[in-house]
């Protein structure tokens, strides 16, 4: 079974150097092993070797049997910076990603990062990433400094993504209400999934997929609670006029055309997502190399599916993420 891992993260060394320059709101220190610690409001990440050494990472993929990874940046993203520096960092990251792809394809493909705090600059950078760097789309965060992805300031970005058939992979970030999630790592364990669910539902009810039907949406972490809550969203559509204002079909009909990555390694949850969206819309994802991610767990969950599940179709196609790269 060919494996295309569409949910994983990489910090280009050039990006880490830029964070250390003193121009960023992000602070970089080091742990006892010398790994960079990336501090940003409300959280921090440990950048282990797999986060920042592409040769090391390629060796891991070869050992584990992953054919391709579609690499993306991760939190804190560039939108936490000033608009000008966000655009600088996004271009730097995307140039680094394009270089990795040019040198190491088909082992690696990539999605662009965007300076989402500046919607106009995001349009410009997505166009550059797709036309000049030949990246198939971008990863976007589930909110932008508290602003919903459904906000109309982002619609010019969606207009371009629709015109080009771009991939937009929604990845969670610090959610609204994060002040209630300061203990027990509740923000990534619970808050991330809540924010993904909220972003997807808000986009649908706002009419974004109705207006821009050619965007190829991907939701991380099996869509948060979307497969579980879709029936409730449909009942809202039937019960409340406001929920019908911008869309002509039930929310689930839009959401079933989206893609969902498998960064939830529970077999029953994976089967629910497959039942909801179809096997061809559920994509392999590991969240490597985060502490909570796992390539072996990703592989075990896929191989543990019932034999009737068309896993070869599901996890070898990698949707247009790779074929467009």
Question: Where do the protein language model's features map onto the residues?
Answer:
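Helix-coil boundary/capping segments in enzymes
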Residues: 1-325
């Amino acid at each position: 079974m060919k494996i295309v891992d569409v949910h994983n993260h990489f910090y280009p060394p050039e990006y880490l150097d830029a964070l250390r320059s003193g121009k960023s709101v992000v602070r970089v220190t080091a742990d006892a092993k010398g790994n960079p610690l990336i501090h940003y409001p409300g959280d921090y990440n440990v950048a282990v070797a797999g986060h920042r050494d592409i040769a090391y990472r390629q060796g891991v993929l070869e050992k584990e049997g992953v054919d391709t990874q579609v690499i993306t940046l991760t939190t804190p993203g560039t939108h936490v910076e000033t608009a000008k520096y966000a655009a600088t960092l996004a271009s730097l990251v995307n140039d680094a990603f394009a270089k990795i792809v040019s040198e190491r394809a088909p082992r690696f493909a990539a999605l662009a990062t965007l300076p989402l705090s500046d919607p106009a600059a995001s349009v410009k950078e997505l166009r550059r990433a797709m036309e000049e760097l030949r990246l198939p789309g971008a990863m976007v965060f589930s909110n932008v400094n508290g602003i919903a992805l459904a906000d109309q300031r982002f619609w010019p970005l969606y207009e371009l993504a629709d015109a080009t058939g771009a991939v937009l992979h929604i990845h969670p970030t610090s959610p609204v209400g994060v002040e209630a999630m300061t203990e027990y790592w509740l923000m990534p364990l619970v808050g991330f999934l809540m924010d993904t669910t909220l972003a997807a539902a808000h986009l649908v009810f706002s009419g974004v997929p109705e207006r821009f039907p050619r965007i190829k949406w991907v939701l991380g972490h099996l869509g948060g609670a979307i497969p579980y809550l879709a029936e409730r969203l449909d009942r809202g559509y039937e019960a409340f006029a406001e929920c019908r204002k911008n869309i002509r079909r039930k929310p689930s009909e839009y959401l079933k055309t989206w893609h969902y990555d498998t960064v939830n390694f529970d077999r029953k949850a994976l089967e629910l997502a497959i039942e909801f969206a179809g096997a061809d819309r559920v994509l392999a994802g590991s969240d490597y190399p985060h502490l909570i991610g796992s390539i072996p767990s990703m592989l075990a969950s896929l191989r543990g599916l019932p034999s009737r599940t068309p896993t070869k179709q599901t996890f070898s196609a990698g949707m247009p993420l790779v074929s467009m790269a």
